[in-house]
């Protein structure tokens, strides 16, 4: 079946400027073109031809002033083409809608990122200025910790959505892992890894020296017990006069500071309440894990932490800062409640560290061993038991090494250097001088040895050997006290300090669409 449609097009004749006919001024003379298009309805006989466009020859008929073009063009619009067109339009509209929704999501994310960055820009400025670490004080100087404070600040900065803190890490969580990480990064940024390399080579020596100190301490106890057994077996006692063993045993019972401090040195008597320190109280805790962003600690972290502590806190030889304690580094090492107790604990540790090389030197020096045997023979003259004499000689060597260690620590606390490994020239204490140690006749201040180690070097060793978790928590305790007393922040608490946070957000888009996403931020 065919239906013909005639479309007539009229065009102006060339050369006719006014658009009026020469014969009829009131009528416009135009050329009429006739284009007849046949709409073809397919039937069963010519289905194959339904997919073809058929054109017939066009003929131009000239009729005087008019030119008429006649002919036929057959056009077809199939169901397939219609569906294709609909699908194409649907795809375009779907892509447009998807892009629009994605753009709305991006705007919400941008709002949230901006708000989170603004909140983390509100770090505690005194903490950064004096201790070079970043943290938000979640109490906001109110004295009360609340995560709602952080959510309110997010809303204030434009993230007015349904927000919930999915995970949060405070400074005191995980034994101060976050604080230690920031302290280490500060040291690497300021000094570089090369600064730590010069100490990393000594760490194995320090560990070995600590192990040897434990072994020699056990050996000393075993030697003392063995001598007592021998004496008990003979039902005798060593004489009390001119007895190095008894004299040194008495020195060990006396306060160590009486032996090692320079004459007329005034010891700080400042104290703190141990129960108020983060190490001993119940602290605020965060929630959630940050295993995806946490770094593994190691030897380097211990060295960096020790360097950070020595740079930011005062020790016995430094000028006091005016905080709750004067000997801050000693507190970090010992954790006692008073300056005196902390200094005593550190001095005892130093004596033990120096005891190892001193005893090893005596074991290799035949001259001094001979002196010890002679003194033991004098003590045991009445006993006439060789085993007792030999045990007493070993006991005298141990006592002599202890006395030399006291002299070494006295040297260190005087701000001088002591030899790492002793020789005849650097050995300070004679056997006769051992009997004067701790008496009125004891006037030696210790000899300064060029190229040796000073007090700060040994403190660095002690910091490395101490447990990192304890050091970190005590360090944060000193910071808290200093912030409260020195830097006029009475409500500051270290367990209110936030360093990492992830926020879960739900927002409403148009037409009831909900969008959930997470935003993480942490100080690096």
List each language-model region with its residue ranges.
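Long, compositionally biased low-complexity segments
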Residues: 133-524
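Alpha-helical assembly-interface signal, strongest on the long, hydrophobic N-terminal helix that forms
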Residues: 6, 47, 57-58, 63-145
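Generic structural motif recognizing short loop/turn segments at the entrances and edges of beta-strands
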Residues: 1-6, 33, 114, 164-167, ...
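N-terminal leader/signal peptides at the extreme start of proteins
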Residues: 1-17, 23-25, 29-74
């Amino acid at each position: 079946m065919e239906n013909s449609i005639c479309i007539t097009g009229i065009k102006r004749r060339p050369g006719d400027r006014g658009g009026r006919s020469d014969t009829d001024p009131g009528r416009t003379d135009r050329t009429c073109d006739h284009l007849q298009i046949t709409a073809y309805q397919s039937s069963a006989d010519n289905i194959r031809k339904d997919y073809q466009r058929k054109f017939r020859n066009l003929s131009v008929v000239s009729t005087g002033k008019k030119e008429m073009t006649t002919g036929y063009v057959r056009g077809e619009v199939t169901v397939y083409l219609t569906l294709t067109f609909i699908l194409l339009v649907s795809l375009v509209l779907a892509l447009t809608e998807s892009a629009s929704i994605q753009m709305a999501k991006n705007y919400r994310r941008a709002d949230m990122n901006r708000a989170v960055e603004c909140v983390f820009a509100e770090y505690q400025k005194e903490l950064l200025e004096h201790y070079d670490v970043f943290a938000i004080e979640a109490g906001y100087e109110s004295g009360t910790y609340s995560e709602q404070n952080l959510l309110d600040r997010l809303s204030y900065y434009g993230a007015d959505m349904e927000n919930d803190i999915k995970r949060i890490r405070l400074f005191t969580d995980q034994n101060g892992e976050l604080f230690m990480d920031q302290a280490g990064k500060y040291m690497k940024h300021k000094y570089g890894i090369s600064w730590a390399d010069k100490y990393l080579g000594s760490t194995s020596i320090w560990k070995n020296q600590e192990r040897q100190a434990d072994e020699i301490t056990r050996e000393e106890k075993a030697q003392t017990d063995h001598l007592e057994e021998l004496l008990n077996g003979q039902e005798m006692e060593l004489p009390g006069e001119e007895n190095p063993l008894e004299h040194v045993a008495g020195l060990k019972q006396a306060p160590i500071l009486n032996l090692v401090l320079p004459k007329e040195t005034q010891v700080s008597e400042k104290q703190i309440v141990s129960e108020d320190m983060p190490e001993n109280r119940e602290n605020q805790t965060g929630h959630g894990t940050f295993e995806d962003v946490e770094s593994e600690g190691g030897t380097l972290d211990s060295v960096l932490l020790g360097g950070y502590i020595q740079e930011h806190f005062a020790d016995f030889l430094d000028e006091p800062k005016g905080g709750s304690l004067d000997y801050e580094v000693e507190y970090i090492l010992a954790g006692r409640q008073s300056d005196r107790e902390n200094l005593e604990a550190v001095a005892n540790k130093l004596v033990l560290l120096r005891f190892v090389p001193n005893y090893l030197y005596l074991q290799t020096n035949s001259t001094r061993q001979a002196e010890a045997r002679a003194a033991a023979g004098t003590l045991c003259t009445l006993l006439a038991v060789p085993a007792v004499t030999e045990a007493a000689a070993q006991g005298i060597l141990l006592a002599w090494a202890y006395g030399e260690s006291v002299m070494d620590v006295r040297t260190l606390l005087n701000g001088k250097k002591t030899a790492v490994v002793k020789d005849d020239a650097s050995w300070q204490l004679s056997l006769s001088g051992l009997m004067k140690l701790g008496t009125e006749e004891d006037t030696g201040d210790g000899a300064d040895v060029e190229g040796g180690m000073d007090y700060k070097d040994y403190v660095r060793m002690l910091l490395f050997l101490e447990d990192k978790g304890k050091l970190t928590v005590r360090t944060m305790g000193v910071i808290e006290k200093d912030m409260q007393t020195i830097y006029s922040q009475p409500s500051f608490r270290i367990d209110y300090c936030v360093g990492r946070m992830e926020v879960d957000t739900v927002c409403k888009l148009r037409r009831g669409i909900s969008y959930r996403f997470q935003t993480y931020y942490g100080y690096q």
